[in-house]
């Protein structure tokens, strides 16, 4: 299954690491466009310049790990498409250009199911998607989640519980399913 990952899923670290971890397990084929990756990098500027540099390094590593993930949008496609937020049309165009099965996004209102269905696409929320991946490979996804929890402990010095970390990362159902 090919899934286009929206920038809003790539930007939060825990969410990104979990979704990318599922892709590394071979549970799905990730897709993105240069524009989506650029949106992610620019969004990190709100933190500081170092965060943007870090994000750009992460982007290089992602493109190296998944060389077939990058999608080039077919010329003229965006002009025939419509979404409630015109700034998101490029995401839909990338999913169509990449022959994706779905789009993973947190922006449900900007990606109406009816419009996506007309284009042969499914909308996935990251929490729902990660729960599906957990059902497909419980051992693998548990391993990914455990590694993220260990990294959170190492980086933050805070003592996180899995469910609390996943809830903070806006993945509450996934966190509950792990317990």
List the predicted regions and their residue ranges.
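PIN/NYN-family metal-dependent endoribonuclease catalytic core
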Residues: 13-47
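Short beta-strand and adjacent tight-turn residues that come in two discontinuous sequence segments
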Residues: 105
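Active-site neighborhoods of divalent-metal-dependent phosphate/nucleic-acid chemistry enzymes
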Residues: 67-102, 136, 152-157, 168-179
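Domain-scale selection of a single, long terminal region
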Residues: 41-74
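Residue-level detector of structured alpha->beta connecting loops
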Residues: 27, 99-100, 120
């Amino acid at each position: 299954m090919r899934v286009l990952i929206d920038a809003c899923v790539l930007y939060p670290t825990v969410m990104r690491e979990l979704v990318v971890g599922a892709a590394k397990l071979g549970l799905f084929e990730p897709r993105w466009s240069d524009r989506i990756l650029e949106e992610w990098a620019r969004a990190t500027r709100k933190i500081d310049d170092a965060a943007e540099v870090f994000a750009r390094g992460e982007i290089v590593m992602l493109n190296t790990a998944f060389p077939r993930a990058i999608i080039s949008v077919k010329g003229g496609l965006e002009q025939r498409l419509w979404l409630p937020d015109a700034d998101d049309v490029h995401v839909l165009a990338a999913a169509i250009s990449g022959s994706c099965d779905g789009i993973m996004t947190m922006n449900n209102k900007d990606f109406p199911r009816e419009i996506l269905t007309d284009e042969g696409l499914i909308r996935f929320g990251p929490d729902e998607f990660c729960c599906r991946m957990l059902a497909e490979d419980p051992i693998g996804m548990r391993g990914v989640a455990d590694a993220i929890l260990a990294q959170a402990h190492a980086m933050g010095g805070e003592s996180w519980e899995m469910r609390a970390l996943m809830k903070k990362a806006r993945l509450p159902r996934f966190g509950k399913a792990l317990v």
